[in-house]
Every structure is written in C-alpha cells, then in structure tokens.
Design a protein with these regions (language model features):
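Short, glycine-anchored, charge-dense loop/turn motifs used at functional sites
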Residues: 447-452
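Short, well-structured beta-strand/strand-turn elements
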Residues: 134-147, 271
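Bacterial N-terminal signal peptides that target proteins for export
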Residues: 1-8
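Middle-to-C-terminal accessory/interaction subdomains
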Residues: 28-29, 39-41, 48, 71, ...
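Internal "kinase-insert"/substrate-recognition segments embedded within catalytic cores
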Residues: 94-100, 107-109, 114-116, 136-141, ...
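Conserved NTP-binding catalytic cores of kinases and kinase-like/nucleotidyltransferase enzymes
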Residues: 22-127
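Residue-level detector of functionally pivotal "anchor" positions at catalytic/ligand-binding pockets or at interdomain
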Residues: 410-442, 453-454
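Bacterial N-terminal signal peptides
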Residues: 8-17
Length: 458
C-alpha cells in the first residue's frame, strides 16, 4: 500500500514538473537574463544588478556575450498597465557598456516588451513600427522577436526593442541637462509625452474643448524655474495655435509634415488611444535665428490598435480622449499634408507592409505556442497559440482599414516638389477657390482637399 502510494506521488510530481518545464522553441534568438543571486525583479523604480547574454541560434544575428562570459547590466521592470495587469512582465535592460544588439545600433538602453495585452498575434506593435518606418517618421524604434530565459526559467515570447530616448541612434537631437538656466540651451532637447498617468513634474492644462490634459517630461526630468517657464509657455503656445485662427502661427510652432505622418500611422492602425497616452513630441534647440518646431513622434504603444473596428476617424467618438488631434484635423494645411502622405503610402507601401506582417507572424508561430503553455491561466491571459488564425484576423483588419481610408481619401494627393499653387487666401491663411472650395493643383490636375479630381489637362 505504501509503495503504491509513493509511486503515485512520484508520478504526480513528475507530471507537474513536466507541465512547468516548457523550453524555448529554438526558432528565435534566446535572451538569457540573470540577476545576481537570483533575486526577483519586483518593481520599476529600482535596478537589480545582473548579466545578459544572447544566443542567436541559427537566425543570422551575432551573439552577444556567452554563457561563460555574459555582459553586466542593470535590470528592472517597466510599463504601466502592462506591468500591473499581467503576470507576464515587461523589463528594462541597461548595459554597463553600450552594445550593438541583434543588428540594432549601439546603445546601453533596451526594453523587453512582453505584449501580454495583445490578442492579435503579437502583431500590433511590430506592424505599427513597420508602417512608421515606411512612412518615414524621423526615427522609429526597431525590435526583434526573442525568447526570454530569466534566472534559468523560460518566460516565453518577447520583443527586444530600442528604448525611446534622446541620443545618437535614437531621437537624435541635442540633449538638454537637468536644471539648465541658459537661455539658448533651454530652447531644445525636449521630449514630452501626452500622458494619462500623473507624475510630479506634469504640465496640466485644459484643452480648448474642455478636456483636461497631462503632459509628462521625458527629457529633461528635473527642471529649473527657467526651464519650467519655457516649457509651460511652449505647450500653451502649441495649444493656442492648434485652436487658433492663423495657419501661419500653427506652421511656425508645429512641423505639419511630421504631424501628418504620425497621424497617418495611427489612423491606419485604428489606434483610438494614440493621442491619449504614450503620445510623444520632441523639439531640438533653436539655432542661428531659426526656431525649431515641435514634432510628433516617435511612435510607441499600439496596444489598442484595431480594438474598435469602427468606420470612423480615431478622434471621432473615441474610447479614450484623443487630445488635440480632433482640432488639428480641421486645419486644411494638415488635411493636405495627410493626403500627400496617404498617396505615398497607398501607392508604395500598403502591399509591402501586408506581406511583411504575414512573414513576421509566421516567424512567431512556434514561440507563440510555447508562450501560451507558460502563461495560460494567469492574470488577463491572451491566447495567441493559433497564429495562423490570428494572423489572418489581423490582416483582414488591416485590409478593412485601408479600404475604409480609401473611401474617405481616394488615392490621396500626389506630393508637390515645388510648393502648392492655389488661387487665393482667406483671412486666416487657408487656401480658397472661387466659391470657397478648397483646392490643390499638381501635375496638371486639380483636386479638392478630399482628393477628388475636379479637372485634368490629360
């Protein structure tokens, strides 16, 4: 009786151990991350010392360190909802020495995105980044899918990603130091974020439509009184220009082309949280009498992309407040810039991005199955084990959105090479035609601002 009972206990223990012993799929690079003494990573504020090495397997990437000579680094948690709402945690890596990682340019700072909130085959962030890169925002974070082993335990599928920060190979503007008081230096090196989380140095104001807006500071973080006065005045001036009546004033403070590119990425991805949180803007230093303009970007979080699946603009009855963009979209100069970027994307990139998304999803298939084995049954678990179905679902949503935008904009407006010819200017700097209809003339064709052809010389 006792022998049989012991055998049963052993079998149960072995089965339980087998359930937990999920191994990497071997189809992606493996990141081995180990904390000193095996201590857990329990918060986002305090770094834990440790080591990292990367085995690329047969993926074509270069190795980084080895099991016997790993690289020293500082490790901590990161994220907001993705940190608090899921057992599968995202992480930040800060190498002691700058490293080139999986073909991405040298830097100390990297993040491991868990994508535990993505139920569309882990494709939201990767494809959002692909579109941003294709459209040509000045800098787009790069990422590589990997499998993570933390303190000897397999954690599943992650995305090793460039950390958004000011610096060479990232947002390449001149850095501004904390507590700076120099009048010239404080005009640039800013990166801020329209945020939905309160921080101590937040700038808060009421948008002209009554919505309360919080802007957090990425760089610099600790402000002198001179810096704070400058940045508060800049945010106020930007808000006033967006809600003002002068196109010239808007174009003087905001880079319209970059704003149009950023918006188009969000509209294609149908991201209804895109101007609510993780919406970044940056500004370089003024120089030689030239005032540098604020630029939207870089893109970051597409965690709610394609959630709504609605035939309306991302700022039209949004799930979350979409700050500034609803008003910005009323400006003809902005509409025109968006139509130009849409023309380029529609003719040059839409099909290539679709295929890139399919190929990327196929790379994740086996790792996604292993990830589901690890995290099934945990908090807010999203099951991405059936990548073929989820890939098809994502592509259908992408195609649907492209088709809906085509119904609104047509093929867009061909970009001008030497400015725009129009017939007259109204009292607020908007371009008008005889009866008040907005037009644009290019390449022998006359378009409405919606992209419809009025007449052609051909």
């Amino acid at each position: 009786m006792k022998i049989g009972r012991y055998i049963g206990i052993v079998v149960v223990c072995l089965l339980s151990a087998g359930i937990q012993a999920v191994n990497p799929s071997g189809t992606l690079p493996i990141v081995y991350m180990t904390t000193n003494s095996g201590q857990p990573i329990t918060d986002k504020e305090n770094y834990v010392p440790g080591t990292v090495y990367i085995d690329p397997l047969n993926t074509g990437y270069a190795a980084l360190g080895t099991s016997t000579a790993p690289l020293t680094a500082q490790l901590k948690g990161r994220g907001n909802w993705t940190w608090s709402g899921f057992d599968k945690k995202p992480y930040k890596i800060k190498f002691d020495v700058k490293q080139t990682v999986l073909g991405m340019p040298m830097n100390k700072h990297w993040v491991l995105i868990a994508s535990a909130d993505d139920w569309l085959g882990y494709l939201r962030n990767p494809v959002g980044f692909m579109i941003s890169e294709a459209i040509g925002l000045r800098w787009t974070p790069r990422l590589v899918p990997i499998e993570l082993v933390l303190n000897g335990k397999y954690q599943g599928l992650y995305f090793l990603t460039e950390h958004v920060r000011v610096g060479k190979n990232r947002v390449n503007i001149r850095e501004q130091t904390d507590l700076c008081t120099n009048a010239d230096s404080i005009t640039g090196g800013w990166m801020v974020e329209i945020d939905n989380y309160w921080t101590e140095n937040n700038i808060e104001f009421d948008e002209n439509n009554g919505q309360h807006v919080m802007v957090s500071l990425d760089v610099p973080k600790v402000l002198s009184s001179v810096q704070r006065t400058y940045i508060v005045n800049q945010i106020e001036a930007l808000n006033n220009a967006i809600y003002g009546n002068s196109s010239a004033a808007l174009e003087q403070i905001l880079d319209i082309k970059e704003a149009a590119k950023y918006y188009l990425v969000q509209e294609i991805m149908e991201d209804c949280e895109s101007y609510h949180g993780s919406c970044k803007l940056y500004k370089d230093r003024d120089s030689l009498g030239t005032v540098d303009k604020w630029k939207f970007g870089p893109v970051w979080d597409f965690g709610n992309a394609y959630d709504r699946h609605a035939e309306r603009w991302i700022y039209d009855e949004p799930t979350w407040a979409q700050y500034w963009i609803g008003q910005l979209a009323t400006w003809p100069v902005f509409q025109n810039a968006v139509k130009e970027q849409w023309w380029i994307y529609y003719h040059q990139h839409k099909d290539a991005i679709r295929q890139q998304a399919i190929d990327f999803a196929n790379r994740l298939t086996e790792a996604a199955k292993r990830d589901a084995q690890v995290w099934d049954g945990t908090s807010n678990f999203r099951n991405n084990s059936n990548m073929a179905d989820l890939r098809n679902d994502f592509i259908n949503r992408y195609n649907w959105r492209i088709n809906w935008l085509y119904q609104q904009w047509g093929e867009g407006i061909p970009p001008a090479t030497e400015g725009v010819e129009r017939t007259q200017t109204d009292e607020v700097g908007r371009k008008m035609l005889r009866d008040g209809q907005l037009i644009i003339q290019r390449g022998g064709k006359t378009y409405t601002i919606q992209g419809q052809i009025l007449q052609s010389e051909y």
